[in-house]
């Protein structure tokens, strides 16, 4: 009988010891200093003690406050201390969002000023901690309006389970499955105190959500970057998740991959990798970034292609020319020839345009033409933007302009220094350029009727006209006075020499403008085009055409509704007076003061306007250096 009672007595003794430990030992062990080995009783060290009487002595972890922002409020310190000491929350991290200086607009950074993230031991622990915290905020800080999300009380869960059992019997139903996201695994509290938000999560849920990555600084993001798990799972969503997060195999479409471009694959969470590629691309490290190629990812290939352009622009011209062949081969190898997007073709145009300007004999203008033809043949429609790019290349091409690049200069993609190479007439050069533009326009707009394609200009973007006017004029000539140069001149130019233009094609453009844009002076865009045309004619000293065009513009610039209040714009008149004065022709200046000045007053222009007065003062010095004429104007 005694033998039969011993196991029961021993089991009862073990339960008694465990209950004593739970009641008296838990708080002190978890929150007391670490015990030394000498403080353990001899009974615990007895090797003959049965296993069911042995208990593990848990060594307490020291309480450590996390690093808090320097300018954080005192209440944040108090709350974090309360979470650790009273609620038992572990691994707390605090993120300061009050000084967000990143250029990218991220909505997650505008939720609050301080984000606190902590880990609980279990779902029940988090439920208890959330309830205790709401009571603490209410009684300690008097904030009954604090909001909590994600807290599901046991009573609600029990009622939900009973309701499901009544509907479907005792068998489990799809609605009862939490799909791995159990209740109280993530609790968020808006404390309504100093813009502090608190997130309590279980360890598993915290790892899955990785909230730290949302609110950490850009420098710390690699610390929280998670690699996609590769282990197989029997989760019903594992197949879908694996499809969307697995690395995609690079397709070659029958073309062998160049040996210097090893394959690069990136997982679904790839922001750090993309940031690294952006840095490499902007710095021009095309050899380094080429290691990360993936022809299935247009974003990556665009960065690789742009790195070649940035590399070239960061070099002196002589070194850039030395690397040109190697750079060209690397660019063409990285270009996705069979599935290139419109952006890829645009980047390729910029690269080829740069190479053509550097060495026109090695890369002729035909490579730029072939790039657009290639884009069209691959199913991409040529747009007005492409037309502008093409005209810009025609204007700046050293081959078409019979010029060469000065090897002693530094290359600049926007303003490249060229020198004239021959004596070919400007008109023949201009005609050749316009022929190429007309051919390209037919490619962009195949439905245009045969004949002069410039007659259909009214259907294009108005910004194309200044480019065409540049083709028919010599704006780069050393004697040509541009509007910018005119504003910088403080005195008239002595003995200004006329700068010729392509009269035939300028007249054709003027005819198109006369039909499509008669009201020159009523619209800002058309007004600038009108000023450009006047400048071309004035630089050629064709003053009769200048005034004829001016009269036609004034006649067509009357407001449509005569009863409306119409105040004439003084800026075109001020520009015309300044243009006549700075070119410095005394005879023409006197004609203007005799005939055009009364016309200006008749059209309601205020002669006391500061711009009018400044330009007129210079004009009077040109027309009457002895200061004896035009008393009425003075």
From Swiss-Prot:
One of its GO terms (cellular component) is mitochondrial inner membrane. GO terms for biological process: mitochondrial gene expression; mRNA stabilization. Probable mitochondrial mRNA stabilization factor. Keywords: Membrane, Mitochondrion, Mitochondrion inner membrane, Transit peptide. It is a peripheral membrane protein. This is ATPase synthesis protein 25, mitochondrial. InterPro entries: Atp25 (IPR040152), ATP25_mRNA_stabil_dom (IPR025210), NT_sf (IPR043519). It holds the Pfam family mRNA_stabil. Belongs to the ATP25 family. It is found in: Mitochondrion inner membrane. The lineage of its organism: Eukaryota, Fungi, Dikarya, Ascomycota, Saccharomycotina. Its main location: mitochondrion. Residues 1-36 form a transit peptide.
């Amino acid at each position: 009988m005694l033998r039969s009672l011993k196991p029961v007595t021993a089991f009862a003794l073990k339960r008694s010891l465990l209950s004593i430990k739970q009641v008296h030992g838990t708080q002190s062990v978890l929150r007391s200093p670490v015990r030394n080995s000498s403080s353990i009783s001899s009974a615990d060290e007895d090797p003959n003690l049965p296993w069911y009487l042995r208990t593990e002595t848990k060594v307490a972890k020291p309480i450590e406050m996390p690093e808090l922002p320097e300018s954080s409020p005192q209440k944040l310190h108090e709350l974090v201390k309360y979470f650790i000491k009273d609620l038992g929350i572990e691994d707390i991290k605090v993120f300061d969002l009050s000084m967000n200086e990143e250029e990218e607009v991220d909505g997650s950074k505008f939720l609050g000023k301080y984000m606190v993230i902590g880990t609980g031991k279990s779902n029940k622990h988090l439920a208890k901690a959330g309830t205790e915290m709401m009571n603490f905020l209410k009684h300690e800080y008097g904030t009954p309006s604090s909001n909590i999300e994600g807290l599901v009380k046991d009573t609600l869960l029990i009622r939900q389970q009973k309701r499901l059992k009544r509907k479907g019997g005792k068998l489990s139903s799809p609605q009862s499955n939490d799909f791995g996201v159990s209740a109280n695994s993530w609790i968020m509290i808006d404390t309504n105190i100093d813009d502090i938000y608190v997130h309590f999560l279980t360890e598993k849920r915290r790892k899955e959500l990785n909230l730290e990555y949302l609110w950490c600084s850009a420098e710390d993001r690699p610390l929280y970057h998670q690699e996609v798990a590769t282990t197989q799972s029997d989760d019903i969503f594992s197949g879908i998740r694996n499809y969307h997060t697995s690395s995609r195999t690079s397709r070659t479409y029958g073309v062998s991959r160049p040996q210097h471009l090893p394959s690069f694959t990136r997982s679904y969470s790839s922001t750090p990798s993309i940031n690294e590629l952006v840095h490499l691309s902007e710095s021009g490290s095309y050899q380094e970034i080429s290691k990360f190629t993936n022809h299935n990812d247009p974003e990556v290939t665009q960065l690789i292609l742009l790195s070649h352009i940035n590399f070239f622009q960061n070099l002196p011209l002589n070194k850039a020319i030395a690397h040109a062949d190697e750079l060209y081969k690397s660019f063409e190898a990285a270009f996705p020839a069979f599935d290139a997007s419109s952006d890829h073709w645009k980047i390729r145009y910029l690269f080829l345009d740069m190479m053509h300007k550097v060495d026109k004999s090695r890369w002729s203008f035909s490579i730029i033409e072939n790039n657009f033809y290639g884009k069209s043949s691959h199913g991409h429609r040529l747009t007005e933007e492409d037309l502008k790019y093409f005209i810009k290349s025609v204007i700046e091409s050293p081959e078409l302009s019979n010029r060469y690049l000065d090897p002693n200069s530094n290359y600049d993609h926007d303003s490249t220094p060229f020198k004239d190479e021959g004596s070919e007439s400007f008109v023949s050069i201009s005609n050749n350029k316009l022929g190429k533009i007309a051919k390209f326009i037919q490619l962009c707009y195949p439905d245009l009727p045969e004949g002069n394609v410039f007659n259909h200009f009214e259907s294009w973007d108005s910004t194309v006209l200044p480019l065409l006017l540049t083709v028919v004029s010599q704006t780069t000539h050393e004697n040509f006075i541009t509007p910018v140069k005119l504003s910088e001149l403080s005195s008239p130019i002595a003995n200004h020499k006329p700068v010729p233009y392509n009269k035939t094609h300028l007249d054709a453009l003027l005819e198109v403008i006369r039909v499509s844009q008669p009201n020159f002076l009523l619209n800002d865009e058309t007004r600038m085009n009108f000023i450009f045309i006047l400048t071309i004619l004035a630089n050629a000293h064709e003053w009769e055409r200048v005034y004829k065009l001016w009269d036609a513009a004034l006649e067509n610039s009357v407001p449509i509704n005569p009863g409306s209040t119409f105040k004439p714009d003084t800026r075109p008149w001020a520009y015309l007076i300044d243009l006549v004065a700075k070119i410095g022709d005394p005879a023409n200046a006197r004609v203007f003061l005799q005939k055009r000045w009364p016309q200006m007053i008749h059209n309601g222009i205020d002669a006391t306007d500061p711009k009018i007065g400044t330009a007129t003062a210079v004009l009077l010095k040109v027309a009457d250096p002895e200061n004896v004429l035009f008393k009425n104007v003075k």
